């Protein structure tokens, strides 16, 4: 699933490698081709150019490894992206499910001075509206870091219910970048109350995870966009395994 409006190929590739690392997925050229819907030869040519530019190197196992410069640039573009998402939700009040695609445009044009103003304006957030850590904050403000906000280890919903004898109570912690470009899916998650900070009950079903609980309010406070039974109880939602694997939770 790719976002529309990405205008810088180098930054797009750097951010994709950064995303894969966050998800614990080995960054290979094949994974980039899948994520960005590009052909193998196109990806190989771009990776070769980035290697010549000193942004990454290809290890013996074909894994892509960012150089120090490449990691610095990848961190910056992801920081801009997630700060833009925070602004779009909190100030501009764009619907939660739409902010990722819009932020994909902003991340390539935002200056560091604007980043700092947004960061201070919003009260120094350390996570985006999807629960992901905003990286590289120490570059904006000396001594600042998001490292300490990883309080409890989290895991994909699919792992949380694996080998479980019954339902699992958990808190939604984050939704990975990979699924955020799918507006229909993100709206489904919001309507089911599957958003960061929400308590849910998880059960294994064939081919995926059934999610109970959630909340009658989404992250942007819009109760009308949440599916309830008329009594304020959110209807359960069945997530396919390939979606549930990108929704992380912390077990209670």
Q: Which role does the model predict for each range below?
A:
Residues 1-37:
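Extreme N-terminal segment that seeds HTH/winged-HTH DNA-binding domains in transcriptional regulators
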Residues 41:
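Key DNA-contact positions within bacterial/archaeal DNA-binding proteins
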Residues 47-48:
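Short, hydrophobic-biased segments on the C-terminal half of alpha helices
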Residues 51-59:
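A short, conserved structural fragment
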Residues 62-81:
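Basic, amphipathic "hinge/linker" alpha-helix immediately C-terminal to the N-terminal HTH DNA-binding motif
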Residues 108-242:
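Mid-protein regulatory/catalytic core that forms ligand/cofactor-binding pockets
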């Amino acid at each position: 699933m790719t976002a529309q409006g990405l205008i810088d190929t180098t930054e797009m590739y750097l951010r994709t490698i950064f995303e894969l690392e966050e998800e614990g997925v080995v960054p290979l050229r094949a994974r980039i081709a899948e994520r960005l819907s590009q052909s193998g030869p196109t990806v190989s040519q771009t990776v070769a150019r980035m290697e010549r530019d000193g942004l990454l190197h290809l290890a013996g196992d074909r894994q892509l490894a960012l150089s120090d410069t490449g990691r610095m640039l990848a961190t910056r573009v992801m920081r801009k992206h997630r700060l833009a998402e925070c602004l779009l939700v909190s100030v501009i009040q764009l619907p939660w499910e739409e902010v990722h695609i819009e932020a994909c445009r902003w991340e390539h044009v935002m200056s560091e001075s604007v980043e700092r103003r947004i960061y201070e304006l919003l009260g120094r957030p350390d996570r985006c509206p999807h629960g992901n850590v905003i990286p590289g904050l120490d570059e904006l403000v000396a001594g600042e870091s998001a490292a300490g906000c990883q309080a409890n280890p989290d895991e994909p919903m699919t792992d949380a219910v694996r080998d479980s004898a019954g339902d699992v109570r958990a808190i939604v912690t984050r939704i990975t970048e990979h699924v955020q470009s799918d507006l229909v899916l993100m709206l489904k998650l919001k309507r089911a109350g599957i958003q960061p900070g929400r308590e849910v009950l998880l059960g294994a079903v064939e081919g995926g995870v059934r999610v109970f609980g959630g909340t009658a309010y989404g992250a942007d406070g819009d109760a009308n966009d949440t599916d309830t039974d008329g009594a304020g109880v959110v209807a359960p939602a069945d997530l396919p395994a390939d979606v549930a694997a990108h929704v992380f939770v912390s077990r209670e």
